[in-house]
Structures are given as structure tokens and as C-alpha cells.
């Protein structure tokens, strides 16, 4: 599954993308399969722990799989209830992050107007919408950042005059090297700037 797709608007019918004047890249945020998976697993596990704690207190079996009424409420049932509560709080955070699509957005490069726009969704509040705009003339290069090891990092950055580097790729699982190089080369060619970091 590709997290960042590139769509050229205004392509010519014969497939030549050189006629395109707008480049739009969709960036996947927290609505990834792995986040749905972990939110579901944590919700199920935490619900089981909480129901086991409540069952040991009420001496009524609320679970299908096992009979937690045999547990002594203090300390086992109480601890299971606390674990369940903590797990449900974590699951709530994961589900809210998915609902809000944290980190999702797009990169828009328009040669007609000479502007770029980087848009991302953040946490609710006054900074919910994160927008960065600049002129295409101010772009110095497209930079590829590759760091291997236990915590690998593979990302594309836009180097803009008078600003710090602007990240263009998603946060989370790193892109493959081939995909990163292809996206970087395509963007550098579109903007007419050098590609750094290879």
C-alpha cells in the first residue's frame, strides 16, 4: 500500500507529464491499516481486562471465554480493572488519532501561480490546520534524508530559502528506497531544482 501518491493534473492524453503545471501529492496520515489494527486489538484486550475486573467484583460472569468470578477482587480483580481502564484510554487516543487523521494532508505545487502549499491535519484547536506556503522561486533543492539502523528514517525534504527544511513525506513506516528516489527525482524535475542526498 502506497502512503504517498502523486497525481499530475492536466496531463496530456498521450501520457506526457511535461505538459502538466500542477503536481498534487496526497500524504497518508494516521488512517493507516496498522493504526486500525492496533486500535482494534487494544480495544478488545482492554475491554476483556475491564470486564474481568468488574466480574470479580460483582461475582457475575461477564466474559464468554473464561470465568473471572473465581478471582479475588483485591488485588487481582482491581489490578485487571486498572489495566483495562488504562488500555481503554490508550485505545481512545488511537481511535481519536484515526478520526482526526493526524498528519494527513497534501503537497501542492503549482507552476502556473508559482506557489507551493503544504497542508497537514493536526490536533483539534486553533492549530488544527497546518499550512505552509512559499514561492517556487524560493525553493533551493529537494533533499533526501536516509538513515539506516534500528530506527530507520527515509524522508523527502524541501529546502527553502530563509526557512528550515520542510518535510514532505509521511511520518511512520519509512518509504522504500526506490519509491523515495522516484518521488524525489519526479519532484526535483517538476520544480527544476537539484536533488540532494543521494
Curated annotation (Swiss-Prot):
The cysteines covalently paired via disulfide bonds are none
Which keywords, in A-to-Z order, does the entry hold? Membrane, Photosynthesis, Thylakoid, Transmembrane, Transmembrane helix
Kindly report the protein's main subcellular placement as a broad class.
Answer: membrane
Q: Which GO terms describe its cellular component?
A: photosystem I; plasma membrane-derived thylakoid membrane
**Compartment(s):** Cellular thylakoid membrane
The similarity annotation says: Belongs to the Ycf4 family.
Functional note: Seems to be required for the assembly of the photosystem I complex.
What name does the UniProt record give this protein? Photosystem I assembly protein Ycf4
Transmembrane stretches in the record are 38-58, 78-98
Entry's InterPro entries?
A: PSI_Ycf4_assembly
Q: Which organism is it from?
A: Trichormus variabilis (strain ATCC 29413 / PCC 7937)
Outline the segment boundaries, as ranges, of region: Disordered. 1-20
Instruction: Give any single GO term for biological process.
Output: photosynthesis
Q: How does it sit in the membrane?
A: Multi-pass membrane protein
Amino acid at each position: 500500500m502506497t502512503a504517498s501518491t502523486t497525481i499530475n493534473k492536466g496531463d496530456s492524453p498521450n501520457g506526457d507529464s511535461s505538459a502538466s503545471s500542477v503536481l498534487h501529492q496526497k500524504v497518508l496520515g494516521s488512517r493507516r491499516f496498522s493504526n486500525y489494527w492496533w486500535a482494534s486489538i487494544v480495544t478488545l484486550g482492554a475491554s476483556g481486562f475491564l470486564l474481568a475486573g468488574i466480574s470479580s467484583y460483582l461475582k457475575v460472569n461477564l466474559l464468554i471465554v473464561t470465568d473471572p468470578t473465581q478471582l479475588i477482587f483485591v488485588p487481582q480483580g482491581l489490578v485487571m480493572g486498572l489495566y483495562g481502564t488504562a488500555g481503554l484510554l490508550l485505545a481512545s487516543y488511537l481511535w481519536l488519532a484515526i478520526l482526526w487523521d493526524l498528519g494527513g494532508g497534501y503537497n501542492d505545487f503549482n507552476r502556473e501561480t508559482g506557489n507551493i502549499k503544504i497542508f497537514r491535519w493536526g490536533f483539534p484547536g486553533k492549530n488544527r490546520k497546518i499550512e505552509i506556503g512559499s514561492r517556487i522561486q524560493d525553493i533551493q533543492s529537494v533533499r533526501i534524508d536516509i538513515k539506516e539502523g534500528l530506527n530507520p528514517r527515509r524522508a523527502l525534504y524541501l529546502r527553502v530559502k530563509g526557512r528550515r527544511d520542510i518535510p514532505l513525506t509521511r511520518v511512520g513506516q519509512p518509504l522504500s528506497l526506490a519509491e523515495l528516489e522516484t518521488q524525489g527525482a519526479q519532484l526535483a524535475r517538476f520544480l527544476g531544482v537539484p536533488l540532494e542526498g543521494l
